[in-house]
Amino acid sequence: MIEVKNITKSFDGRVVLKDISTTFEDGKTNLIIGRSGSGKTVMIKNIIGLMKPDTGQILYDGRDLITMNKHELNMLRREMGMLFQGSALFDSMTVMENVMFPLDMFSKDSTKERRKRAEFCLERVNLSEAGHLYPSEISGGMMKRAAIARAISLNPKYLFCDEPNSGLDPKTSLLIDDLIHDITVEYNMTTVINTHDMNSVMNIGDNIISKLKENLMVCC
């Protein structure tokens, strides 16, 4: 569970987030909804520790991210999976190599076990036959699924997605929505998604909108 308590963030005197409080539950698909410029990217950057709020607390199962030292923050980030806007795959790597990248960086398992885990993740997103291909050789939807496989490769406790449907057609967007939602439930992750797509709210938002702050809504 992630608890956001009364966070405020300003830039050059302009308040972007003002006294935001909400809770993101385990096993739920939690949505941060807003138009461009509403503050949703700033909010998620604060939640994952890339920015520090001016005031407030961000608690991960009771642990305050804001007061963590560098080592504690690095350990917490190893529990996070990230799905960026676009796919953010490495063009010079195959799909399999992209999925194995975080495993090679952080996993202490043997090479055989790391590859087995990557193969499992690709199978989970229905890309078993695409591991040898490069990003330039697959569709946008397949790249997004490959990015999801990479994001879950380390079996994260928390999954953060920034506009996961960006650039996708409606049919593919629905498939990506369903995949993220199913994986969230399957692994009991705390998933937080930035989106301006109200179709995603209807497709995968687990709970009603519980907080409204100016142009920013949190569905959790």
Predicted stretch roles:
Residues I48:
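Helix-to-loop junction immediately C-terminal to a conserved catalytic motif
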Residues Y134-I138, M142:
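Conserved ABC ATPase signature
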Residues P170-T172:
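Helix N-cap at the start of a conserved alpha-helix in ABC-type nucleotide-binding domains
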